[in-house]
Amino acid sequence: MKQPGPNETRVYVWDLFVRIFHWTLVVCIFLNFFYTEAGEKPHEVLGYVAAGFVIARLIWGFIGSPYARFSKWFASPRTVYLYLKNFRTREIYTSHNPIAGWMMVFLMLCVLSLGLTGFLLGTDTFFGEPWIQDTHKWISNIMMGGVALHVTGALYESYHEKRNLIASMVHGYKNK
């Protein structure tokens, strides 16, 4: 890990709950997409764990530590526009940058939508209903595209900012 330079300070950004949330989602999504069988109990349990963690994270986004709060990193469309317009000389954010903030919202909405469609598939009314199954699969594939963009963005920003963003999601600290 890069040590803070003479003009940098180390900041505790990602609290324990945020990091547990993040890595729990990584495991649940990875296992459900690549290993478990749709409709089987492990797939359901992992899906409900992921959806439950997203609900808890939404609550934490209002009452949690300062960098966990949506008010700290949820950007207006104008802020996103200015960020993209000045992409080469853009500001470096301690928390999520404007694009990453919107990506977090997108991924959380995907997980909640998967939880809802997965739940519906387990009900008598919608069990085996093709349009719900297709919607569930469609959302899953779109979410995995978002995950790929998220990982690519984190790697790119780690290179651009010269600080390991993935490691910060392990130990919680970023150099500012």
Description of each model-found segment:
Residues 1-176:
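Membrane-embedded alpha-helical bundles that constitute the cytochrome b-like, heme-associated redox core
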